[in-house]
């Protein structure tokens, strides 16, 4: 236990049923008191005579410095995993590997250059593990394995509401689209280019009809989706299919307080011109409709309903939709 009694030493402090990362603030040999400061602000005073390894134990160097792949952590428990994710998050390193699994922490902000064309190009030229963890590394490995293994590949994206599943899906599709356009062999035909554009640009339409504001997430997907991409032998995207399931149909007629119906209804009222509103006998605002206003929330400062309407109308042309 002597190694713990050094100011600045990093330790794990057990608090009830959880472990807290902490630092030894001071150690008085006169009265035998050890002062520990948890990373979350709590200060704990412990008598050295009462110390045991169940209460306080040294933090492994890998947990102190942080690692890119958590399978290499010297101590593998829930607290070490969460602490490592937090260490990287504080440095804007939102991606961390756990073996072949990629953990992503939503930064709730834009990180400059993280998804730039230069980064796409960089990850397209390296194998998994050669560069820092990134969703582009997963997408590239998936694309390469199509040809290495001559078999279909699958990427599963899961997480709680607001974790970033929708954005992660967009980024995967973005990377695969670039790889398709840059693939060798015959240059992509005009038809193939339209297919790529339709798949990439499907997100605004899917979000408009399937996403809604909830108390936890202003752009929450209220459905799941299964996306299939079909590649030619030369590596081009030649087709695709998006299947939705478990749509929250009851939201159309009832929403919890502070939530909204699906985005499309509000964007239609915000973006449609007078002629279109008159044609469909629409009122000027969502407040006139019980199904849109019963929750007490019809607008949100973070949502641009008019812009979404414009996006849906523009990107709907990529599908060559008919009305």
Pin down the residues of each PLM region.
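Short coil-to-beta transition motif at edge beta-strands of beta-rich domains
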Residues: 2-14
């Amino acid at each position: 236990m002597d190694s713990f009694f050094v100011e600045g030493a990093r330790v794990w402090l057990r608090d009830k049923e959880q472990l807290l990362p902490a630092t030894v603030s001071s150690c008085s040999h006169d009265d035998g008191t050890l002062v520990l400061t948890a990373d979350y602000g709590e200060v704990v005073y412990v008598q050295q005579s009462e110390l045991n390894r169940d209460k306080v134990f040294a933090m492994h160097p890998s947990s102190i410095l942080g690692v890119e792949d958590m399978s290499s952590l010297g101590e593998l428990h829930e607290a070490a995993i969460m602490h490592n994710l937090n260490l990287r998050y504080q440095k804007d390193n939102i991606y961390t590997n756990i073996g072949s699994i990629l953990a992503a922490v939503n930064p709730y902000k834009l990180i400059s250059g993280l998804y730039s064309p230069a980064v796409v190009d960089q990850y397209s030229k390296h194998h998994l593990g050669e560069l820092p963890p990134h969703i582009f590394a997963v997408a590239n490995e998936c694309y390469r394995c199509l040809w290495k293994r001559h078999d279909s590949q699958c990427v599963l994206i899961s997480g709680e509401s607001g974790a970033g599943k929708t954005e992660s899906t967009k980024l995967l599709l973005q990377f695969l689209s670039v790889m398709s356009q840059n693939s060798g062999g015959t240059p992509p035909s005009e038809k193939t280019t339209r297919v790529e554009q339709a798949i990439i640009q499907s997100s605004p339409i899917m979000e408009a009809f399937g996403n809604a504001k909830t108390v936890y997430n202003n752009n929450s997907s209220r459905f799941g989706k299964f996306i299939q991409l079909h590649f030619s032998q030369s590596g081009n995207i030649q087709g695709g299919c998006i299947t939705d399931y478990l749509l929250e149909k009851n939201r159309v007629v009832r929403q919890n307080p502070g939530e909204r119906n699906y985005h499309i209804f509000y964007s239609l009222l915000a973006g449609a011109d007078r002629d279109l509103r008159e044609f469909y006998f629409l009122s000027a605002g969502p407040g006139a409709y019980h199904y849109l206003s019963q929750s007490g929330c019809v607008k949100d400062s973070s949502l641009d309903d008019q812009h979404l309407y414009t996006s849906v109308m523009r990107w709907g042309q990529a599908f060559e939709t008919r009305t």
